[in-house]
Swiss-Prot record:
It catalyses: L-glutamyl-tRNA(Gln) + L-glutamine + ATP + H2O = L-glutaminyl-tRNA(Gln) + L-glutamate + ADP + phosphate + H(+); L-aspartyl-tRNA(Asn) + L-glutamine + ATP + H2O = L-asparaginyl-tRNA(Asn) + L-glutamate + ADP + phosphate + 2 H(+). The keyword Nucleotide-binding applies. Keywords: ATP-binding, Ligase, Nucleotide-binding, Protein biosynthesis. Allows the formation of correctly charged Asn-tRNA(Asn) or Gln-tRNA(Gln) through the transamidation of misacylated Asp-tRNA(Asn) or Glu-tRNA(Gln) in organisms which lack either or both of asparaginyl-tRNA or glutaminyl-tRNA synthetases. The reaction takes place in the presence of glutamine and ATP through an activated phospho-Asp-tRNA(Asn) or phospho-Glu-tRNA(Gln). Belongs to the GatC family. Its EC number is 6.3.5.-. It comes from Hyphomonas neptunium (strain ATCC 15444). GO terms for biological process: glutaminyl-tRNAGln biosynthesis via transamidation; regulation of translational fidelity; translation. GO terms for molecular function: asparaginyl-tRNA synthase (glutamine-hydrolyzing) activity; ATP binding; glutaminyl-tRNA synthase (glutamine-hydrolyzing) activity. This is Aspartyl/glutamyl-tRNA(Asn/Gln) amidotransferase subunit C. The gene is gatC. SUPFAM superfamilies: Glu-tRNAGln amidotransferase C subunit. Heterotrimer of A, B and C subunits. It holds the Pfam family GatC.
Length: 95
């Protein structure tokens, strides 16, 4: 699969990113390079290799799984440009 100028233009439009026409070829090349690396990774034989999250084995401290709201709603909403009834108010994002 190869990424074309039209693919870059479409992704930019869907993600609402302004991409100048003169950069479309450059970005298509970069994305094709990334996809090439992914193809190389897919060729690696990982049969029998245990999944890991770190090269150093560590133990994370355990704590009780307790549901809490944090009791800091006012502090959190203080950072919001706008809130109503204890919730963030954001602009409509779906057309």
């Amino acid at each position: 699969m190869s990424v074309t100028r039209d693919d870059v233009r479409k992704v930019a439009r869907l993600s609402r990113i302004a991409v100048p026409e003169e950069r479309l070829d450059e970005l298509a090349g970069e994305l094709n390079g990334i996809l090439g690396w992914i193809d190389q990774l897919n060729e690696v034989d990982v049969e029998g290799v245990e999944p890991m999250t770190s090269v150093v084995e560590t133990k994370l401290p355990m704590r009780d799984d307790v549901v809490t709201d944090g009791n800091i709603q006012d502090q959190v909403l203080a950072n919001a440009p706008r809130s109503e009834h204890g919730f963030f108010v954001v602009p409509k994002a779906v057309e």
